[in-house]
Amino acid sequence: MDKIANLALSLKEDMIKDRRYFHSHPETGWFTFFTTAVLAKRLSELGYEVKLGEEVVKSDARLGVGSKEQCQKAIERAKSLLNPNEAKYLECMKDGLTGLTAFIDTKRPGKFSAFRFDIDSVDVTESAEAAHRPCKEGFGSDIAGITHACGHDGHMAMGLALAKLIAKNLDDFNGKFKFIFQTAEEGTRGAVAMEAAGVLDGVEYLLGGHIGFQAETNGGIVCGTNKLLATSKFDVHITGRSAHAAGAPEEGANALLAAAQMALNMHGITRHAKGVTRINVGVLRAGEGRNVIAPNGYLACETRGEDTNLNEFMYKKCMDIVKGVSEIYDVESKVVMTGGTSGANSDKEVTEIFYEAAKQSPFIDDDKIVKELDFGACEDFAHFMRALQDRGAKSGYMMIGTNLKAGHHNSKFDFDEECLVAGVDIYLRAAYKLNGAKK
C-alpha cells in the first residue's frame, strides 16, 4: 500500500468510533444542534477556521424548518448531551441555523477545493431486533422515531478523517480547502440556504458522495453520478366550509373533494417528451366527521424532473391544477414550499479524478469500478453542483460501495464500515490530484 492508503487505514478505528457516536445521537432537518457542535469543536481543534449560524445559513432561504417548540426541544436535548466546550457553539445556532463550514489555507498558491458531507438523519424508527448490529453492539439511536438510516453518520466520520489527514499533512498541499457539513439534506432543504449565505464563494472544485445506492458491494465505486433529478416539495392546505351533509349541503365547500380532485389531476399530468418527469401525492388528509361537509384538506406533494426545466414544467402544471380546482370547488388553497433542488450532472473532469483515484486505491476492486451512472433520484448536493457549474467551477458526485443490511431509509439499515476507509482514500487521492504540492 502507498502513503495515501496507509493514511486512510490509520484512521479506520477512529472513523468507526465517530460513526457509531453520531449514529447513537441522531438529529433531523434544521435541528442538528448536537451534531454541529461536536463537529465544530473537533474541526477547530484541527486548526480549521469554523463558521456557523448566519455566516453559513441564510435564515429566510430555509424551507421546512419546523416549529419553535420542536426547535427548543432539540436544543434542550443537545445541551444534555454536550460538554461545556461543545455547548458554547449552540448560541449562534439558535432558531435552527445549524450546519457549518471549516476552512484551511496552505498559504501557497493553488486551487480552492471543497468537500461536502451531509449530517442529518431521517424520520425512521430504528429496528430493535437483536440481530440489528447497532442494537446488538450498543450504538442504536437514543431517540424514538429518528435514526441514521441513510449513512450520513458514515459521511461525517469520513469528513472528519479527511479533514484531519489534510490538516496533519498540510505541507503536502497547495491552495485552500473548505469542508461543508450540510444539514437538512433529507427533503432537499439545506443546500439552497447555505449557498445563499455564500458558502461556495471562490470555490473552484466541489466534491461529494454517498455510500451505497447503486454502489452495492464493498470495493465498488461509481465515479461520476449523472441525472440527479430536480425536485420541488410542497404542501397544499385547503380551506372549505363545513355544513350538515344532509340538512344543508349547499352551504358547504367540500375541501375533501377538492383535495381528491387535485391529487387525481396531478397524477394525470401529461409527461414531457424531453426527459424523465415524476409526480407523487404522498399524503392526503381531509374532513372532520361522517355527516359534515369537509372544511379542510391537506396534500403533501412532490415533482421531479431530469433537469430543472422539466421539474418546473411539472410544478407549474400542479399549480394550475390547484388554482383551477380551488375555483371549481369554491375553496381557498395555500401552497407552502417545503424543499427543492436543481438537477445536475457530474463534470467530466471530476469524474476522471475519482476514476483515476479508484484505479490507484487498494480498497477498490478493478472489476467494480463504474465510471459513470445515472442516479435517477434527487440529492440536495445537486443544488451546490448546479450553482458552481453556472459560475464556471467544477463539481462531481461519487457513490462508494458497501454491503447493506437493508436499503436506505429502512429501519434495519446498516452498512459495512470497511467502506469508510475506501471513501477517505478516494477523497484524499482526489485532494492530492487537485491540490498536491509538486516536490
Predicted regions and their residues:
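Histidine/acidic-residue-rich, glycine-tolerant segments that coordinate divalent metal ions
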Residues: 64, 100, 122-124, 133-147, ...
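DPxDG-like acidic metal-binding loop motif
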Residues: 156-162
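Acidic/His- and Gly-rich active-site-bordering loop/insert found
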Residues: 2-148, 161, 172-173
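Metal-dependent amide/peptide-bond hydrolase catalytic core
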Residues: 257-439
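Divalent metal-coordination and catalytic microenvironments
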Residues: 22, 115, 152, 179, ...
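Short Gly/Pro-enriched turn/cap motifs at secondary-structure boundaries
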Residues: 89-94, 185, 224-228, 372-376
